[in-house]
């Protein structure tokens, strides 16, 4: 199936003398040339997130001369971001990611315009925001935002480039419900339903090899330039799958699913994706303790079994003194339940409190009715009780 598309953007009227000098290596490419560079100059591209995928994509789109770049990010730079989010530096830790990204972009190319949207993308603002741009790029790492971006792009009539990464793997594609010649597909044609909560970890939980971000982001940026200028064949209707350990790329055809309901409105995506599973939320009700409460329990000599449900690689980085490692996967399979002591109150913890709530549901179903989990996980414990603790 051919996915050649007409140019998404009309060309600007002219290039300045400075622009001709700056983009000269583009101008001498026959398929791109002056016309293509004028289209890049006139383009308005919105990038969702200045994180692992957004960071290198923003840098290359800016260097390529995309005339207006919008950045959606409400987060601040954390030291753990620097391993892969190359648009930020040590001096930016604690700063707004959007502002840090803007400063890096301006340092590379002062000829373009950068618009900041320091907000949380939500059903109340997504469609109106998308209508201000020609093209959207989504590299977010949670399913609620991915489905929101997809549905808002459909309602706004906008194409978007999507990418994702996990450990040593990456994926990328182009979605555009209203693409010409009946080529339209959207994210729900590939993934009609989100996976069960907890099945697919985020980068914070599962990790990612930092340089994988550059590989996938370069594909995303390339697709953006192809869409804007109308050159080549895009990934519309195809999923690109990258495996860094095998150093392989393969593509999978995406076809329109006629059974997928038509998107007519935005919904509550946290609820739709079940960010926390229903049984986990139910188990945590009345069975959640704060770091302060755990400290008091430990100091009082209460009989506890402190259970770390994270993966062994996380345990090796840091753990709470006196804890026992029983990964959530072993608890869910039943193998780890036999390791839980019967004569003490089990206190489960993970990194941020999500996985421990999910493990708590399995523990309670097994008869450990007095088991509890730690609110906010080891991150909250470190911040409130042990600020000198190493954190990842």
Swiss-Prot record:
Regulation: induction: Up-regulated under oxidative stress conditions.
Gene Ontology CC terms, in alphabetical order: cytoplasm; cytosol; membrane; peptidoglycan-based cell wall
Localization: Membrane
SUPFAM superfamilies listed in its UniProt record: Activating enzymes of the ubiquitin-like proteins (SSF69572)
Record key words, sorted: ATP-binding, Membrane, Multifunctional enzyme, Nucleotide-binding, Nucleotidyltransferase, Transferase, Transmembrane, Transmembrane helix
Pfam families: Rhodanese, ThiF
Top-level taxon in the UniProt lineage: Bacteria
One Gene Ontology term from the biological process aspect of the record: symbiont-mediated evasion of host immune response
Domain Rhodanese: from-to ranges: 300-390
Residues annotated as the enzyme's active site: 203 (glycyl thioester intermediate), 350 (cysteine persulfide intermediate)
Signal sequence, start to end: none
Binding annotation for ATP: 52, 73, 80-84, 97, 141-142
Primary localization class, coarse: membrane
Keyword Transferase annotated: yes
EC number: 2.7.7.-, 2.8.1.-
UniProt-recorded Gene Ontology molecular function terms: ATP binding; nucleotidyltransferase activity; sulfotransferase activity; thiosulfate-cyanide sulfurtransferase activity; transferase activity, transferring sulphur-containing groups; ubiquitin-like modifier activating enzyme activity
PANTHER family, per the entry: ADENYLYLTRANSFERASE AND SULFURTRANSFERASE MOCS3 (PTHR10953:SF102), UBIQUITIN-ACTIVATING ENZYME E1 (PTHR10953)
Protein's job: Catalyzes the conversion of the sulfur carrier protein CysO to CysO-thiocarboxylate. The reaction is thought to proceed in two steps: first, ATP-dependent activation of CysO as acyl-adenylate (CysO-COOAMP), followed by sulfur transfer to give CysO-thiocarboxylate (CysO-COSH). The sulfur source is unknown.
Record protein name field: Probable adenylyltransferase/sulfurtransferase MoeZ
Organism: Mycobacterium tuberculosis (strain ATCC 25618 / H37Rv)
Lineage, opening ranks: Bacteria, Bacillati, Actinomycetota, Actinomycetes, Mycobacteriales
Gene that this polypeptide is encoded by: moeZ
């Amino acid at each position: 199936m051919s996915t050649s598309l007409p140019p998404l953007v009309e060309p600007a009227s002219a290039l300045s003398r400075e622009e001709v000098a700056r983009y000269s290596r583009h101008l001498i490419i026959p398929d791109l040339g002056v016309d293509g560079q004028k289209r890049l100059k006139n383009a308005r591209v919105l990038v969702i997130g200045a994180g692992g995928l957004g960071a290198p994509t923003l840098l290359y789109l800016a260097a390529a001369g995309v005339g207006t770049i919008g950045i959606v990010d409400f987060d601040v730079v954390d030291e753990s971001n620097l391993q892969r989010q190359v648009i930020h530096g040590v001096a930016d830790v604690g700063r707004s990611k959007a502002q840090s990204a803007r400063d890096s972009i301006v340092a590379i190319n002062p000829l373009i315009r950068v618009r900041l949207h320091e907000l949380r993308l939500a059903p109340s603002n997504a469609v109106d925001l998308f209508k201000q741009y020609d093209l959207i790029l989504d590299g977010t790492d949670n399913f609620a935002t991915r489905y929101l971006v997809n549905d808002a792009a459909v309602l706004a009539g906008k194409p978007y480039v999507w990418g994702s990464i996990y450990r040593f793997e990456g994926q990328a594609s182009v979605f555009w419900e209203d693409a010409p010649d009946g080529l339209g597909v959207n994210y729900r044609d590939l993934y009609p339903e989100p996976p069960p909560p907890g099945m697919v970890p985020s980068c914070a939980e599962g990790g990612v090899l930092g340089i994988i971000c550059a590989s996938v982001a370069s594909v995303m940026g390339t697709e953006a330039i192809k869409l804007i200028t109308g050159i080549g064949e895009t990934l519309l209707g195809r999923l690109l799958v990258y495996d860094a350990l095998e150093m392989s790329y393969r593509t999978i055809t995406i076809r329109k699913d006629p059974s997928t309901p038509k998107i007519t409105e935005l919904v509550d995506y946290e609820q739709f994706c079940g960010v926390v599973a229903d049984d986990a939320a139910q188990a945590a009700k009345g069975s959640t303790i704060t770091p302060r409460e755990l400290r008091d329990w430990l100091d009082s000599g209460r009989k506890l079994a402190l259970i770390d449900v994270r993966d062994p690689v996380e345990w090796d980085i840091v753990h709470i003194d006196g804890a026992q490692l029983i990964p959530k996967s072993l608890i869910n399979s039943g193998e780890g339940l036999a390791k839980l002591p019967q004569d003490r109150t089990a206190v489960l913890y993970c990194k941020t409190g999500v996985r421990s709530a999910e493990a708590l549901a399995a523990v309670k179903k097994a008869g450990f009715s007095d088991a509890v989990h730690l609110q906010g996980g080891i991150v909250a414990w470190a911040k409130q009780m042990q600020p000198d603790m190493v954190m990842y």
